Amino acid sequence: MEMAPCLWLLLSALIQLSTSQRSEPMFSSVTKTVLQPDYENNPTQLNYGIAVTDVDGGGDLEVLVAGYNGPNLVLKYDQRRKVLHNIAVDDRSSPYYALRDRQGNAIGVTACDIDGDGREEIYFLNTNNAFSGLATYSDKLFKFRNGRFEDLLSDDINVRRDVANRVAGRSVACVDRKGIGRYSIYIANYANGNVGPHSLIEMDEAASDPLNGVIALHNMAEEAGVNKFTGGRGVAVGPIISQTLPDIFCDNEYGPNFLFKNNGDGTFTDIAAQAGVDDPHQHGRGVALADFNRDGKIDIVYGNWNGPHRLFLQTNANRKQRFKDIATQKFAMPSPVRTVIAADFDNDQELEVFFNNIAYRGSSANRVFRVSRREHSDPLIEELNVGEAAELDGRGTGAVVTDFDGDGRLDLIVSHGENVAQPLSVFKVNPGSANTWLRVIPRTKHGAFARGAKVVAYTKKSGPHTRIIDGGSGYLCEMEPVAHFGLGRDVATSVEVWWPDGKSVARPLTTSDMNSILEIPYPVDEIPVPESVEIECGHGFAANENGRCIDKDECTQFPSVCPRDRPVCINTFGAYKCRPNKRCGHGFEPNEDGTACVAQVAYFGGSPSSSSSCLVGVHYVSIALLGLACLL
């Protein structure tokens, strides 16, 4: 007996609805065993941003926590006791004592090497007594000097320069804007009228003497073209549009987002509207960068405060760099979101997106989605069972991923605050324990973590996987400076690292490199690949004479790889597409698949139309008579 089609549809919908509940829980809490709440190590206080760096210079990664109504924390993992403990203790003789900064209301935190000494400085953004505009207490920029951490912004030379940020801000991030291996601190300030533009603090090389500990700072935001006034919220940095130089994406509140494209000289131009990511009527929060469909282009995922969340896939239709929102209805469901993280938690090759929500006017569970690549189609997005990381009543304010215990599986740390003091939460991942993994740590020419570098792992079966070494993302946070690759049952055959200045290294891999951590130093000279080494690049790629995996251009083959009814061959990253020979009239162009004609970028009143409206003040309008279509 056959089942009626409508019943099949109903059954399919019910199965899909229950998938996230039936699947194995992604996260289990280990807070009680790894970071037991107590006054010294995990105090019940208001916390916000979290960052990961090597604080003590010992080679392992520590976790920095921005304390708002309590001290900042520095959590180090004790391999013997299997616990995280705070090394920034209340003892003035401790080299980490200054990092506590008990007087500051810290909200954002980031770390990077600003002076080229090979060790990362630590920046805490404070928002004392201010939601926007001027604050009553300045930010702190800590450098390890004279055997302890000291605040550079308090040095006489910088006090005279009046460089300290005294404006209420939100996120901070690190950007090597010129590709020189020294970083600037990008500060997403929350402006009040014409008070509090975004800032960009970096070392003034001409006035500094790093060998003697003299670091003169200046604000280069105006010269770089990023001194914008807005309600700054989230920031993410990496080669989004550029090949290797870092671009900057900011999702903002009460104003359009920014996508600052690097002009190649360390200055930036905002192209958010042209690229379709300005989202002017929403209020951004957490943001992350990732290559979800493994096409070599960097995509943007972010959450809007009680608005639709976005998953912007980068396209290159007709040689124009644009983004399209592929978020499903469930993925986009509005929530009081804070942090957004993109990572392969279960090491199955596919990326997950974690939404950290704050219990705002009632419970609001955290959520996690898997974004799975599909050939010649947008990725499949499915909600997973978030498990004990749901935290229905958690006042989530920040979160990071890092492998603090060295088992090759990412750990999740969540902070809480806002209006209810809660301790930190720590979660381990349940599924994927048998999956293969690879972790890559590139270094700058000075030996520091190469934040903003692009790392590509080529595999035997699943093509290339791309990661950006994080310089700030999530929301108020900064992830570990590691390219973490989950490989499932696959094997990585080659890894390439691209530094912001365009330098690159290709390293062939063997099976013995799997389940390990690779440190990749900055290339002083070109390192040739031995002729005896045969590199497998996977389907759609081939090794060139320099041992680099490059895309095969199937469209140059003879006879043609495309059939007669779809004769136009379009080479894609690791593959190709065949489409009809569509011809379009003036003002129109073929869509990405060549199946229809769409309007070219339209102009109304002398300015480009936004990605979310066809006419100013008119939304979701179809102008059928003109043959124009709006991509909503």
Describe each model-derived feature in a short phrase:
Residues 132-133, 146-260, 266-272, 279-289:
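Solenoidal tandem-repeat scaffolds enriched in leucines and small polar residues
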Residues 535-561, 580-604:
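N-terminal entry motif of extracellular EGF-like repeats
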Residues 601-620:
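C-terminal GPI-anchoring signal of eukaryotic secretory precursors
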Residues 19-29, 71-89, 133-153, 195-220, ...:
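Beta-propeller blade repeat segments, especially FG-GAP/WD-type strand-to-loop junctions
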Residues 4-20, 619-630:
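Cleavable N-terminal signal peptides of Sec/SRP-targeted secreted and luminal proteins
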Residues 57-67, 116-126, 179-188, 242-251, ...:
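Acidic/hydrophobic-patterned starts of short beta strands in beta-sheet-rich repeat architectures
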Residues 32-50, 68, 92-110, 156-174, ...:
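Repeat-based blade/solenoid architectures
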Residues 20-40, 46, 185, 208, ...:
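Gly/Ser/Thr/Pro-enriched helix-cap/hinge segments flanking short amphipathic alpha-helices
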